[in-house]
């Protein structure tokens, strides 16, 4: 039975690596996957899902105006699709999460979404909010804070490594711009304790 999955975490937990491994597992068994990533995240090249360990795969892009159900349904006219995988799923809109649920419910294709749960201000991203609400299965991918505890928050840093507390929710960056930390160190670094 097809399901909508949401694999969420803070940064540097291996979301893209896990997505790429899942896609590989399907393809190794001669099953087709459709891989999507957000058009606004071009850190490793446009139309690529790339992990920090150096593996990558070409991907279709989704933008705010992309109708994922229509696009996937159109792709089915060319070839069978066994699984849809979405990287950077926090950037999905509410409507796109709904469209992906239709892919599961109407087209009977499993959809695996990978993304951040919250931003640097500990607020849910729109895509994450609706995936947490509507996914059939939720799984947290874990990473650790510099103290060794489970990291479940992310700090945004400036060029000097100082914590930024305000700004736009979306700013594309990697290890140089963000640091995954535990709740205690998030509150401490943000001046909340």
UniProtKB/Swiss-Prot annotation:
<feature type="binding site">
    <location>
        <position position="145"/>
    </location>
    <ligand>
        <name>Zn(2+)</name>
    </ligand>
</feature>
<feature type="binding site">
    <location>
        <begin position="9"/>
        <end position="16"/>
    </location>
    <ligand>
        <name>ATP</name>
    </ligand>
</feature>
<keyword id="KW-0479">Metal-binding</keyword>
<dbReference type="GO" id="GO:0004797">
    <property type="term" value="F:thymidine kinase activity"/>
</dbReference>
<comment type="subunit">
    <text>Homotetramer.</text>
</comment>
<keyword id="KW-0067">ATP-binding</keyword>
<comment type="similarity">
    <text>Belongs to the thymidine kinase family.</text>
</comment>
<keyword id="KW-0547">Nucleotide-binding</keyword>
<dbReference type="GO" id="GO:0071897">
    <property type="term" value="P:DNA biosynthetic process"/>
</dbReference>
<dbReference type="Pfam" id="PF00265">
    <property type="entry name" value="TK"/>
</dbReference>
<keyword id="KW-0418">Kinase</keyword>
<keyword id="KW-0237">DNA synthesis</keyword>
<feature type="active site" description="Proton acceptor">
    <location>
        <position position="88"/>
    </location>
</feature>
<dbReference type="GO" id="GO:0008270">
    <property type="term" value="F:zinc ion binding"/>
</dbReference>
<dbReference type="GO" id="GO:0046104">
    <property type="term" value="P:thymidine metabolic process"/>
</dbReference>
<keyword id="KW-0808">Transferase</keyword>
<dbReference type="InterPro" id="IPR027417">
    <property type="entry name" value="P-loop_NTPase"/>
</dbReference>
<feature type="binding site">
    <location>
        <position position="182"/>
    </location>
    <ligand>
        <name>Zn(2+)</name>
    </ligand>
</feature>
<feature type="binding site">
    <location>
        <begin position="87"/>
        <end position="90"/>
    </location>
    <ligand>
        <name>ATP</name>
    </ligand>
</feature>
<keyword id="KW-0862">Zinc</keyword>
<protein>
    <recommendedName>
        <fullName>Thymidine kinase</fullName>
        <ecNumber>2.7.1.21</ecNumber>
    </recommendedName>
</protein>
<keyword id="KW-0963">Cytoplasm</keyword>
<feature type="binding site">
    <location>
        <position position="185"/>
    </location>
    <ligand>
        <name>Zn(2+)</name>
    </ligand>
</feature>
<dbReference type="InterPro" id="IPR001267">
    <property type="entry name" value="Thymidine_kinase"/>
</dbReference>
<dbReference type="GO" id="GO:0005524">
    <property type="term" value="F:ATP binding"/>
</dbReference>
<dbReference type="GO" id="GO:0005829">
    <property type="term" value="C:cytosol"/>
</dbReference>
<dbReference type="InterPro" id="IPR020633">
    <property type="entry name" value="Thymidine_kinase_CS"/>
</dbReference>
<feature type="binding site">
    <location>
        <position position="147"/>
    </location>
    <ligand>
        <name>Zn(2+)</name>
    </ligand>
</feature>
């Amino acid at each position: 039975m097809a399901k909508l999955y949401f694999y969420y975490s803070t940064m540097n937990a291996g979301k893209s690596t896990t997505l790429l491994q899942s896609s590989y597992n399907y393809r190794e068994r001669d099953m087709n996957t459709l891989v999507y990533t957000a058009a606004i995240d071009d850190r490793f090249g446009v139309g690529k899902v790339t992990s920090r360990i150096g593996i990558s795969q070409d991907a279709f892009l989704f933008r705010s105006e992309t109708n994922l159900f229509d696009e996937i349904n159109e792709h089915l006219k060319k070839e069978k699709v066994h699984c849809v995988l979405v990287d950077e799923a926090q950037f999905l809109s509410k409507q796109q999460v709904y469209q992906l649920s239709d892919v599961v419910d109407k087209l009977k294709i499993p959809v695996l979404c990978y993304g951040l749960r919250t931003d640097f201000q500990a607020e849910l991203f729109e895509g994450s909010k609706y995936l947490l609400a509507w996914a059939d299965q939720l799984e947290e991918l874990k990473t650790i804070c510099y103290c060794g505890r489970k990291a479940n928050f992310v700090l945004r840093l400036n060029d000097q490594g100082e914590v930024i507390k305000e700004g736009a929710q979306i700013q594309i960056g990697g290890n140089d711009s963000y640091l995954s930390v535990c709740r205690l160190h998030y509150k401490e670094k943000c001046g909340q304790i």
